[in-house]
Amino acid sequence: RDVAKYVMMPGNAIKRHVVVEARMKQLAEDADGLPINRVEYNDLSVGFITSGIAYNYVKEAMPEASVLKLGLLNPLPRKLIEEFAAKVDKLYIFEELEPVVEEQVKAWGIQKAVGKEIFTVQGEYSANLIRERVLGQTLEVDPAAQVPARPPILCPGCPHRSVYTVLNKLKIHAAGDIGCYTLGAVAPLSVIDTTICMGASISTLHGMEKAKGKDYIHNWVAVIGDSTFMHTGINSLMNICLLYTS
């Protein structure tokens, strides 16, 4: 038991912050020698800095390229990255979604690095993305075999079906939440008209009432599952109870 180390009340947290910063500094110094950060030198005309599944896409699309595969992303191995960047003619940073590695590398002054200028910040990457954006190849993809559409549906016997069927017959709108019951938004049930995030169904309905009045929501209900209700939905319900009983 070590309260000073494990209980982060303000006085302890200030002292532990010093320890955290010292640990991060040591990690940064050790990062260059960690075996999980691996350099594969091949053709030095092009190099990729990448990690995770994106590494597999690089190897599939351009197996002849040099690659720095990062296993530790925070902190980044600065010396290793600078040495790798200096040895390759063209440098690409291939990371999905936000340019976390790219921004840090460019902040170090490695301006030859190319990342989100040609790679998307949305969706999943693929080997074909590299072939298209780096190699300039026009992809000829065979059309997928025509198969019957099979949209997701609620499981047979699921009680959500019965609830949504009744709401549909009564022409009731529903503010939905996160869960399999979000499928109430699509045919043939077509009841849910809005879904934002976990726990938002109740608060959305409350917000509608505040903005538009009670008459606007007379034919609306909030639909929420048990786990989502315990996540943040209960807070919205408590807020309604407080406001309407005070």
Regions found by a protein language model. Name each.
Residues 51-58, 198-213, 237-240:
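Structured alpha-helical segments in the cores of large, soluble enzyme domains
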Residues 216-231:
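A short, small-residue-rich loop immediately preceding and capping a beta-strand
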Residues 1-154, 159, 171-172:
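Flexible, low-complexity linker and terminal segments
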Residues 142-202, 211-214:
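Active-site diphosphate/adenylate-binding microenvironment
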